[in-house]
Amino acid sequence: MSRLLWKKVAGAKVASGPVPATGRWVSSSVLDPVPSDGQPQSQMPSSENGQLRLNPLHIQMLSRGLHEQIFGCGGDVPDEAAVQRSIEHLRKHGLWGQPTTPLPDVQLRLPRLFGGNLDQHFRLLAQKQSLPYLEAAASLSEAQLPPQPRKWVWAEGWTRYGPEGEAEPVAIPEERALVFDVEVCLAEGTCPTLAVAISPSAWYSWCSRRLVEERYSWTSQLSPADLIPLGVSASASSSTQQDWQEQLVVGHNVSFDRAHIREQYLIQGSRMRFLDTMSMHMAISGLSSFQRSLWMGAKQGKHKTQHPTKRGQKSQKNANGPAISSWDWMDISSANNLADVHNLYVGGPRLAKEPRELFVKGSMRDIRENFQDLMEYCARDVWATFEVFQQQLPLFLERCPHPVTLAGMLEMGVSYLPVNQNWERYLTEAQSTYEELQREMKKSLMELANDACQLLSGERYKEDPWLWDLEWDLQEFKQKKAKKVKKTASASKLPIEGAGPFGDPMDQEDPGPPSEEEELQQNIMAHTRLQQLKSTTDLLPKRPQHLPGHPGWYRKLCPRLDDPAWTPGPSLLSLQMRVTPKLMALTWDGFPLHYSDSHGWGYLVPGRRDNLTELPVSPTEESAAVTCPYRAIESLYRRHCLDQGKQQLETQETDLAEEFLLTDSAMWQTVEELGCLDVEAEATVESSGLSQPLVPPTACAPKTSQPTYHHGNGPYNDVDIPGCWFFKLPHKDGNNYNVGSPFAKDFLPKMEDGTLQAGPGGARGPRALEINKMISFWRNAHKRISSQMVVWLPRSALPRAVTRHPSFDEESHYGAILPQVVTAGTITRRAVEPTWLTASNARPDRVGSELKAMVQAPPGYVLVGADVDSQELWIAAVLGDAHFAGMHGCTAFGWMTLQGRKSRGTDLHSKTAATVGISREHAKVFNYGRIYGAGQSFAERLLMQFNHRLSRQEAADKAQQMYAVTKGLRRYRLSDDGEWLVKQLNVPVDRTEDGWVSLQDLRKIRREASRKSRWKKWEVVTERAWTGGTESEMFNKLESIAMSDTPRTPVLGCCISRALEPSVVQGEFMTSRVNWVVQSSAVDYLHLMLVAMKWLFEEFAIDGRFCISIHDEVRYLVREEDRYRAALALQITNLLTRCMFAYKLGLNDLPQSVAFFSAVDIDQCLRKEVTMDCKTPSNPTGMERKYGIPQGEALDIYQIIELTKGSLEKRSQPGP
C-alpha cells in the first residue's frame, strides 16, 4: 500500500527487494523495528593502525569500521590525475603540506540500516513516518465534501452537521483529516472564540464558553479547558504518543490554529500533524523578498496599467533598483495571504476578508450580534483552504518528491517550548528594570534640557556646536493695564527689583547671619510684597501664558498647565525627538550631529571656507540667530583628536570594531538581508565595459569643496552651513537612504566602539546613551514577548515522570508555549517565526536578553541538542569538492572547511581576514554573504558599514581584492560565433590552458564586432566560469545548479519556486537563486536529521519529543534517564545525515572532522552554551542564583560512547 500510494501521488521510485550487505543493512521490505538478538550492541573491535584512514590529500576519513557499516567494504580509487590537480590547487593557495593532527578514531556499532543504501534507508524511514498522514491527505483532497450548513448552532463546544444540515453535539470530531480554521477576538485576549472544520464526511463548528456565556470578566491566564479539544479523549497522565490516533489537520498558516488546540500543550505530545497551505505555497510558487516588493507594487498599480512589461519599464525608469526585463513570474506566484493564494491556485471571485475586522477591532458583544455572518466567514475560509489544498498537494509532491521533505515538515510543525513560573517572573523583572532605567534616562534628559536652557543667559547658545540652530525666541510676559497707574507701578517694581537678574551680585552677597530685628523686618517686607503680588492677579490674562521667558524649543518639551497629565519640567522629552541628540551633544568621530530636512541626520565637519564670504557684514537678528559657530566646532574636533592621540586632522588606520556579534540565526539573517540588496549586473558589465564603482550622489559637493582630512557619506553642500561641510550618517541600506534617528538599533555597535558618543561635560549624556543601549532589546521586543500564548497545565495533565520527580513543586506552575512556526516561510523553505527563531543570546548590557533561557524543562526532563558546525559552509564546500575532483578537501575552500585551524590561521575566516586586513568576525559575514550569492558591491557596502572611515575607493579596492582571491576571476568560453569572429577580425586573444578567455578580451571581441557589423547582435559566449580563486569551483557548481532548466537541491531533489525558474525569470534574480541552492540544501539537512531522530527515538524507546530548530541547531525535550542515549542518537543522526549528502554527491566517504557534533548539550534551559549564566540588567545574579538552574553538560562523541557503552539500548544506560 505504501509504495502504491507514493508511486501514485509522489511519483517516487522505490526499488523492490534490494539485496542488503551482510551484517550491515536490513532488507527494504522490513519496515518494522529490527528484533533484538538479546545481546547489547557491542563496540567495534579496535586496532591500533587498522582503523585510521586517510584520503590521498592526507585528510582523515571515517574509521574503517564506520565506513564499512555505512558505505560497505572497499571504496572508489581516486583518479591519479584528479589527485595531482588537487595537490597543485592546494599548493597554489598555500595549503598543501600544512601540518594536521589526527583525531582519535570512533569505534561504534551503528543501528542496522534499512534498504540497500543510505538514500533507500532514509526514503523508507520517511515513508513509514509520513504514510498515515499522506493517506489522510490523499483521501481529503479526493473527497466530495458535504454541503455547508445553512445555519450554525449557538452552543458551547463542538457541533457536527450531517449531510442534510442536521446538528448534533459531539465531544470531538473523530476524523483522520480535517481542514481547520480558528478565529480569536483580540480584544478579549488570545483565547479562541470560534472555529470551523470540515472533513470528507461532515462540517463541524466550535464555540467557546466565553462567547456563549456572558460574564463581566474572565481570567487572563489560559488553561487547557479554554482551548479546543481535537485529539482522542484519553487520560493525559497515563497516555503516551502511541495512545493517540494519527490525525492530519490542514490550514492556512496552521501554526496559529495549532496554538489553540488543547492536546498540543501536553508534554508527551500527540500523533496529530499539521500541513500548512501557506508553507506549501512558498515551496511551490513563493516569492523572494525583492520579488514580493515588485509584486505588491505591480498589484497596487494595476488600475493604471495591465501589461507587465509596461509596469517593468515604469519601474526601471523610476526606481533605484535593477532593471527587470522578465515579468512572467508574476503570473505564477502571489503573496502569502489566503485571498491571493486562492486566487492563484483556484481563481474565481476574490475572498471577502472584511468581516475579519470584527475579530481584530470588535468586542465579544459585536461577535455575538453577528454570529451567523462570522461563522459563515470562517466557513468560507475553510472551504477556500480546502480548494487550495486540492490544487497544491499533487504539485508539492511533484516538486518535492523525496518523502523525507514531507516527513520533515510534519515534524517541524509540532514545535514545543516548556516553561514554568519563571516565565512570569522574567516578564515582571524585565519590565520593571526597563521602566526603572527609562525613568533614569528621562531624568537625565530633563536635566540636560534644563541645563541647556541656562545658555540663554548671555546668549551663550550661539557658541554651542549643537544648540545654535534651535528656537531661542522668547515669549514676552503679558498683563492687563492697571487701573491705578502710580500704585501699580510702584508695587510692580518691588518683585522685579527683588528678583534681580541672573548672576546679579545682589543675589550672591553673603552678609552673614541676620539679627533678630533684621529677621523681623525681612518678614514684614516679605509679607508686604506677598500682599502686593496677590493684588496683581487681576492683571493676568484670562488664558495663562505657557512658560513666558523660556525659549521656544523648551516650551515644546513642557506640558501645559491645563493638560490632565501635567508634570513639572520638560517631561515630554523623549529619544524620538529631534532635539534629543543635540541636548546629549552627540558626536560622530568627534563631529557634532546635525539634522537636515532633506538628508536626515548627519554631522558637521569644520574647515569649509568657500561659503564664509557670503555672510552679511551687518547681520540682522534673524540671520545672527542661525549663524553656525564653526570655530567652536573646530575646537571641539581638536579636543577629540587630542583625546584620541591624534596629532593632526588626518585619517588614521583604525581596527575594525567587533560590532557584529553574529551568533546562531543572526548570522544568516543579517547576511541574507544585506545580500538581497545586491544586484547582479554582470551582463551590463560585459557589454558596456564599465567596472567602476557607483558614482556618488549628485548632491555631493564637487572636489573643490570637500575636506582633505575626512571622508564619509558626503559632503552634501546643498546644506549650506557657514564654515562647515555636512556629511550624512551611514545607513545600513546604502547612501541613498536617510537616517531618521541616531538611536536606532543599527547604531548600537557604533555607540559601543565609541564612534557615536555623548559630548563633553557631565555624565548625564553618556549615561543616557548607555541606558538607551541597555533598553533597546526590550523596547523593540517586549510586545512580542509579553503576548506569547502560555497555557498552564493542571497537575492531572502532567505525566508521572514530572509529578513523581523529587524536584516537583506543588506550588509551581508548569506549562508550554507553542511557537507559531511557519515550516516553510521563505523560498528556501526555511522556517520563520518572529520571536524565538530570531532571539539573540543573553548579553550583559541588554535588558530581557535572557529570553531563550526562560524555556526550561519540567522536573524529570532535560533539553538535549546541538549546533551543526558550519552547516552552510560545509554544504557549499562538499558541492565544490564533488564538482572539482570528487574527493573531500580537494578544493582550497573544502580543505579550509575540513582541516583549517584558527590557531594556525588556516581556517576559512582567518584566511579571508588576512587577505583583506579585517577582523575574523567580519570575515565570517563576508564569507557567508558570498555563499548566499552576494556580489562585490555587497562587500563594498558592508566594508563601509563595518568601517565608516573607509573611502568608497578603498572599500572597492578591498572588495575587489577579496573577490579575486576567494571567488576568483570570471572567464568565458567562446561560442562558435565568437571563435569565427576572432578568426575573421584577427583579434588577439590570450587563452588559458582550458581555452577560457578573460573579460578584457571578451570586451575587445564585442567592440570589434559591433564596429564592423553595427546592427547585428552577436552571441559570443557559450559558457561562463570562475577561475583562480579558493572558492571558484564551488561557485561554478552553485551557479550551474541555479541556472539549470529545473534547479533542484542535490540531495533530496526539491525544486526551486516556480517564480524563480529560469524559464520565467531568464537571467534575473541570480542572488536569490544561488542563495537558494545552499540554504534549501541546509533545509534538506534539517529534514534528514528530524527523520533520523524520530526513527531512533521510536526504535530504541527514547522518551523525547522535538522542541525547536533555530537555524542550524536542534533541541529535544527528553526524559532525564534517557538523556545520554538521546545524545548518542543525535551524534548518529549527524553522522548518517552527512554521509547521505556525501553519498548523493558521489563521495562514498566522509571526513572524520565533520562526522560528529563537536558537542551535544544536555541542559535544563535553552541557551547557546551550557556554561552561560545569562547575566543581564534584568537578571544580574545569573541563572543559577536567581532561578536555581545549574550549568549543563556538553559532551563530545568520545564522552557519550563512554557513558552509553556505545549502545542505544535502554538496559545499557547508566544511572544519573
Curated annotation (Swiss-Prot):
Inhibited by dideoxynucleotides such as antiviral agent zalcitabine. It is found in: Mitochondrion; Mitochondrion matrix, Mitochondrion nucleoid. Keywords: DNA replication, DNA-binding, DNA-directed DNA polymerase, Hydrolase, Lyase, Magnesium, Metal-binding, Mitochondrion, Mitochondrion nucleoid, Nucleotidyltransferase, Transferase. Residues 27-50, 301-321, 488-518 are annotated as: Disordered. A motif (Exo II) lies at residues 250-258. Mg(2+) 1 binds at residues 867, 1112. Signal peptide: none annotated. A motif (Exo III) lies at residues 377-385. A motif (Pol A) lies at residues 864-873. The keyword Oxidoreductase does not apply. DNA binds at residues 289, 574, 783, 826, 1071-1072. The active site is at 181 (exonuclease activity). Residues 301-314 have a biased composition (Basic residues). Mg(2+) 2 binds at residues 867-868, 1112. Residues 27-37 have a biased composition (Low complexity). Residues 835-841 are annotated as: Trigger loop. Residues 506-518 have a biased composition (Acidic residues). A 2'-deoxyribonucleoside 5'-triphosphate binds at residues 867-868, 870, 872, 920, 924, 928, 1112. Residues 491-552 are annotated as: Accessory-interacting determinant. Its EC number is 2.7.7.7, 3.1.11.-, 4.2.99.-. Heterotrimer composed of a catalytic subunit and a homodimer of accessory subunits (POLG:POLG2). Interacts with TTC3. Interacts with LIG3. The polymerase domain encompasses three conserved active site motifs: Pol A (residues 864-873), Pol B (residues 920-935) and Pol C (residues 1111-1118). Binds the incoming dNTPs and undergoes an open to close coformation change to catalyze the formation of phosphodiester bond. The 3' -> 5' exonuclease domain comprises three conserved active site motifs: Exo I (residues 179-183), Exo II (residues 250-258) and Exo III (residues 377-385). Proofreads the newly synthesized DNA strand. This is DNA polymerase subunit gamma-1. It comes from Rattus norvegicus (Rat). The gene is Polg.
